[in-house]
Every structure is written in structure tokens, then in C-alpha cells.
Design a protein with these regions (language model features):
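A short linear hydrophobic-aromatic micro-motif
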Residues: 258-264
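Short hydrophobic/aromatic beta-strand micro-patches
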Residues: 273-277
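Conserved small/polar residues in nucleotide/adenosyl-binding loops
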Residues: 286-291
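Short, conserved charged micro-motifs
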Residues: 44-46, 280-285
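ATP-binding N-lobe of GHMP and related small-molecule kinases
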Residues: 1-97, 115-121, 152
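ATP-dependent small-molecule kinase catalytic core of the GHMP/sugar-kinase superfamily
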Residues: 123-258, 278-282
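Active-site-proximal alpha-helical scaffold in enzymes
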Residues: 103-121
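Short Gly/Ser/Thr- and Asp/Glu-enriched loop/turn motifs at secondary-structure junctions
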Residues: 143, 265-270
Length: 295
């Protein structure tokens, strides 16, 4: 039987962007993961991680807790395929920093398998499969990050069951600064961050977030970064997670006074995104100085 080899790259992503909790994510080209798959059809299924390399490969499991392994199993199960799958993973996305690292690995894996087997499924199901794979790292499936890694650009999850996602057109390419704190990663960070979210939310806060989300999306589509940046505010999730990101609110206050377009937490944190449209070098220095002051 023929062994097929394919290598797939999946880029980092930033989920939520302020008010878009669990529905919005943006792919960025600052970091990426790569997965090389060697696939051979067989009577039995076996998935093996040969190696995990790259600057952020240390400590990543090779067993079923690896999102690539979990995603591959889910793909083969849904498509009723059986195969030997050998994986070589290159981790180029910082782990546990809110940049979609686990989701990118899962996304690259399912896209690779899709190109090998060419099953009759669409990208919505591919996103579902990758999200199921990410469950081993995050505790539950999160399609926002994987949708951005698979679709690219600005991805919107507009329906959950069945999952429906779309890549939104962006009329502008803003310059972005990432603040990545050099702190130890909390074990099961995403699960802990979700546990802080309130079960009940006042209607006023929901209305506020909906308005901000509309401004954020409209700004990107219309090419209006001031409008997009005005949408990067969240009255529900970010305040609830304040214990995990104590520096964020003080840093955001400082940066907004420097006329940056927008500031938000990347996913569950701790990384912070700063969006600017002009004076990029000055904003970069301001951001660095402000972060140092709060260190």
C-alpha cells in the first residue's frame, strides 16, 4: 500500500478580540505550527507521534493528550477510514499564551488528512473535528481558534449545532503588537479561565457587548480601524478573568491614552493584542515602556 506524505502549516490565532467570546477569532502570521503526516491505509488504525520539535515543543505529550492525535482519531472515526498515521510536529506557536497553539496543531492535522482522503465533508465539519481534537488540551471543544487557523483571516462562528463558520472579508490590514508575558503557564489554564465566567449576566452588559461586537466586525469589513478598535471592549468575560490577567487593565488604560486603536486579551490570556494604524514604531516603544512599568 502507498504511503502518502503531506506537510501542513497552521497559523496562530487570537480568539474573542474583546466582545466575541467563543464566536470570533483572527489568524495572525506571527507564529505557526507545522504537521508532517505519513498516511498508509490499513485494516487497523494506529496513530503515532514520531517527533515534536521547534522552539515550543518541550513538554508536549506524544500520547492521546496530544491534540494532533485526538484530531486524527476523530477524523478517521467520522470518515470511517482506517490507517497508520505517523506525525512529525513542529511547534512554532508559544504554548499556553492565548495564541491558539493547541488548536493550530489540530487544524493542521485534519487539513492534512482531508487532503489525503478527500472525504465528502465541508470545512464546517473539519472545524468541528479539529475542535474535538483540541478538547484534550482545553477540556471542551473550542471551534473559534481552529476556525481561524483553517479558514484564515477573521473567522466568525455564527451557529454551534450544527456548526457553521464563515471567513469575513477584511478591508484593512492593521499593524498589531503582541505583548506576551514571560510568566509560568497555569495548568489547565483555559479550563480555569472558563470556570471564572459568570453563569448569569445582566441584560445591560449583554447589550453592551453585542453593540461592541457589531462595531468590531463592521470596522474590519469597512476598513475603519477606529470603529473596529472601539469594539474591543468587553463587559462580561475580561472583567471576570481579572485574577488571571491583573496587568491587562492597567496596561490597556495606559495604551488607550496613547491613541492606539484597540487593546484586548488574546483568548484566555495572558497575551495582549494592541492594534495600531499609524505611528507603529512609537506605539511599539510606548507599549514596551508601559509593560515594563507594570512589570
Amino acid at each position: 500500500m502507498v504511503v502518502k506524505t503531506i506537510r501542513v502549516r497552521a497559523y496562530a490565532s487570537i480568539a474573542n478580540l474583546g466582545p466575541g467570546f467563543d464566536v470570533l477569532a483572527l489568524a495572525i502570521d506571527s507564529f505557526y505550527d507545522e504537521v508532517e503526516l505519513k498516511v498508509k491505509k490499513h485494516e487497523k488504525t494506529k496513530i503515532l507521534v514520531e517527533s515534536i520539535l521547534g522552539p515550543y515543543g518541550t513538554g508536549i505529550p506524544k500520547d492521546e493528550k496530544n491534540t494532533a492525535v485526538a484530531a486524527a482519531k476523530e477524523f478517521l472515526k467520522r470518515t470511517s477510514e482506517k490507517a497508520y498515521v505517523s506525525l512529525r510536529i513542529w511547534k512554532g506557536i508559544p504554548v499556553g499564551k492565548g495564541l491558539g497553539s493547541s488548536g493550530a496543531t489540530a487544524a493542521a492535522t485534519v487539513v492534512g488528512l482531508y487532503k489525503v482522503f478527500k472525504p465528502n465533508i465541508d470545512y464546517n465539519e473539519l472545524i468541528e473535528i479539529a475542535a474535538e481534537g483540541e478538547k484534550v488540551a482545553a477540556g471542551s471543544p473550542h471551534p473559534d481558534n481552529v476556525s481561524a487557523s483553517i479558514l484564515g483571516g477573521l473567522a466568525l462562528i455564527y451557529q454551534r449545532k450544527p456548526l457553521r463558520a464563515i471567513r469575513l472579508p477584511i478591508s484593512v490590514k492593521p499593524k498589531m503588537i503582541l505583548v506576551i508575558p514571560e510568566i509560568s503557564t497555569i495548568k489547565e489554564k483555559t479550563k480555569m479561565a472558563r470556570s471564572l465566567i459568570p453563569k448569569q449576566v445582566p441584560l445591560e452588559k449583554v447589550v453592551h457587548n453585542l453593540g461592541r461586537l457589531a462595531a468590531l466586525i463592521s470596522g474590519f469589513i469597512l476598513g475603519n480601524l477606529d470603529l473596529a478598535g472601539s469594539g474591543m471592549f468587553d463587559d462580561i468575560i475580561e472583567p471576570a478573568r481579572k485574577p488571571l490577567i491583573p496587568v491587562y487593565f492597567r496596561l490597556k488604560e495606559k495604551l488607550l491614552k496613547m491613541n492606539v486603536n484597540g487593546v484586548c486579551v488574546c483568548g484566555a490570556g495572558p497575551s495582549i493584542l494592541v492594534m495600531v494604524k499609524q505611528n507603529y514604531k512609537s506605539c511599539l516603544l510606548y507599549t514596551s515602556d508601559a509593560a515594563d512599568e507594570l512589570d
